[in-house]
């Protein structure tokens, strides 16, 4: 849905529940649209979301021209999105880096989510602010899904692969010039 503020989209704004959604938002965090998106998906509906570190990291972590280059910042951003999605009732299925960089050269990532079933009422009724507060508690307590050994490994390896491909492309470009 081009030119639509997804944050404010309601179930009655669309004809049917969605089987699938692809999400590519700019100038806003994914955390702002995951609850509305979840409410529009069918049970077992899936989403693939583009994680853009330049819009997830704080301003102090974004470099010149809006580019985030530090692998540690990429890991932090991915952990935040994985933990947030998990905390609002998504199953996080997969993570990979995008083979296409953002316009300024940002490395971006793809996360695959599934709405398994209706969550407990407390999760279903979460407001955006409630979910953000819950995420802060998860991050402070280092207790989220991203802190499990499996996800720590997946996140680390994905970020390492994305940065090694970035280095490879940079070297190829230098050789061509």
Where are these regions (language model features)?
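Short "lid" loop at the C-terminus of a central beta-strand within the Rossmann-like core
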Residues: 6-7, 53-57, 99-100
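Residue-level signal for inorganic ion chemistry
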Residues: 52, 105
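Short, glycine-/aromatic-enriched active-site segment of Class I SAM-dependent methyltransferases
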Residues: 53-70
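Short alpha-helix
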Residues: 74-88
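Conserved S-adenosyl-L-methionine
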Residues: 90-99
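Flexible, glycine-/basic-rich loop-and-beta segments that form/coincide
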Residues: 107, 111-167, 172-177
């Amino acid at each position: 849905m081009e030119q639509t503020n997804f944050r404010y989209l309601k179930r009655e704004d669309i004809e049917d529940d969605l089987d699938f959604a692809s999400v590519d938002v700019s100038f806003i965090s994914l955390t702002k649209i995951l609850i509305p998106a979840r409410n529009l998906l069918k049970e077992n509906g899936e989403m693939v979301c583009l994680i853009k570190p330049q819009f997830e990291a704080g301003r102090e972590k974004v470099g010149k021209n809006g580019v985030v280059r530090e692998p540690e910042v990429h890991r932090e951003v991915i952990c935040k999105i994985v933990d947030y999605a998990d905390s609002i009732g998504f199953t996080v299925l997969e993570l990979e880096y995008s083979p296409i960089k953002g316009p300024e050269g940002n490395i971006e990532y793809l996360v695959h989510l599934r709405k398994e079933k209706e969550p407990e009422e407390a999760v279903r009724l979460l407001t955006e602010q409630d979910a953000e507060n819950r995420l802060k508690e998860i991050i402070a307590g280092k207790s989220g899904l991203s802190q499990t050994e499996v996800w720590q490994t997946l996140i680390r390896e994905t970020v390492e692969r994305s940065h090694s491909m970035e280095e490879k492309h940079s070297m190829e470009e230098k050789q061509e010039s």
